[in-house]
């Protein structure tokens, strides 16, 4: 008898070997590509959670049903990313992919002292209001937008469960370190880390616990069990392993342990090269982290390091989904499946499925496990 998506997901988290390939879950991370595959314009996809749900229905009728689905629609992803954005139908053509624009929000490192004086919540609220287009002029506007975000998330997560799928996470957070990297901009932040990391460390240590507790409260209020951690600037692509060990890891480890104590699995979205950092995750409670790899990290080495400690997902390349053939996708998936049958593995795309992915290639990922 075929397993349900939730049964497959829980089997993966257990780290126990799979008895057969039907027990292994599959997750093609899709946001904008639901529109391109389902025939919905990107401008409509970004403007409406209902249109995004419609595009999911259309797409799974073509490619089949994955076990896991992203729970945040594109319009809300743009909002919660906390970067200025170019949006289809506004700055971009109607069917273009949305774009994030990274530029320094502050140019004087003394701003770190201002954050310490204001508090992280007040400062970040001010920042998010300023980057809207047009900028928000009062906190009520931001509160209304967060309320809309919550309503959309509830609607989307309810839909995902109604279809027998599992949402990738029930709520999400961006660690303060990574948010600071984006608001300061990568190059300037790297200089700050080398010249005077003290204020950055002070901000992280002082305010991260309260930020985590707020996220825990939101997720637990809705009976959630998973938190998405978008730790996108803590990899070896952006900082040295030494800086990771000295600055990032103590705070990140404490965060993950905090979520674990609250009964939440940490879904670590690990873009870029995490290979030098993965050994640290063996220090954590077994099975408390699920690591999503995008292809920049050697997945076989990652699996060898984390096997028996934490689960991983990956990593069919975006280029293969766009330009390859179903047979090439099937062969790549077969290699991953053979590796992952020892347990703790989810077959998935390497980060997001691209806008120009071929339907038959995305379908081949599901067929590799279910056909």
Report the location of each language-model feature:
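Catalytic cores of TIM-barrel enzymes
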Residues: 1-371
């Amino acid at each position: 008898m075929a397993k349900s998506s939730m049964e497959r997901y829980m089997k993966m988290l257990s780290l126990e070997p799979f008895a057969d390939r039907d027990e292994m879950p599959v997750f093609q991370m899709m946001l904008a590509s639901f529109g391109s595959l389902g025939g919905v314009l990107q401008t409509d996809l970004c403007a409406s959670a209902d249109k995004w749900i419609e595009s999911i229905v259309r797409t799974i009728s073509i490619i089949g049903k994955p076990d896991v689905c992203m729970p945040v629609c594109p319009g809300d992803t743009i909002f919660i990313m906390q970067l200025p954005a170019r949006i289809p139908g506004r700055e971009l053509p109607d069917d273009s992919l949305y774009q994030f624009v990274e530029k320094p929000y502050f140019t004087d490192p003394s701003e770190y002292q201002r954050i310490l004086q204001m508090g992280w919540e007040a400062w970040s609220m001010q920042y998010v209001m300023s980057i809207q287009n047009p900028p928000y002029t009062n906190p009520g506007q931001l509160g209304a937008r967060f309320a809309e975000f919550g309503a959309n998330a509830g609607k989307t997560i309810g839909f995902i469960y109604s279809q027998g799928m599992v949402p990738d996470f029930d709520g999400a957070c961006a660690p303060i370190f990574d948010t600071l990297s984006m608001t300061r901009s990568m190059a300037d932040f790297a200089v700050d880390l080398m010249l005077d990391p003290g204020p950055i460390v002070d901000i992280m240590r002082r305010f991260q616990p309260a930020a985590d507790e707020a996220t825990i409260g939101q997720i637990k209020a809705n009976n959630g069990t998973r938190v998405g951690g978008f730790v996108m600037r803590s990899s070896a692509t952006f900082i040295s392993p030494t800086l990771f060990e000295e600055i990032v890891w103590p705070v990140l480890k404490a965060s993950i342990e905090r979520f674990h104590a609250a009964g939440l699995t940490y879904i670590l979205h690990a873009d870029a090269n995490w290979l030098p950092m993965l050994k640290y995750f063996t220090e954590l409670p077994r099975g408390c982290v699920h690591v999503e790899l995008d292809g920049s990290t050697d997945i076989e080495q990652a699996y060898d390091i984390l096997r028996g400690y934490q689960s991983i997902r990956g990593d069919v390349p975006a280029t293969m989904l766009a330009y390859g053939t179903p047979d090439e996708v099937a062969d790549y998936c077969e290699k991953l499946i053979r590796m992952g049958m020892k347990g703790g593995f989810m077959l998935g795309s390497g980060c997001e499925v691209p806008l120009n992915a071929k339907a038959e290639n995305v379908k081949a990922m599901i067929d590799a496990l279910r056909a």
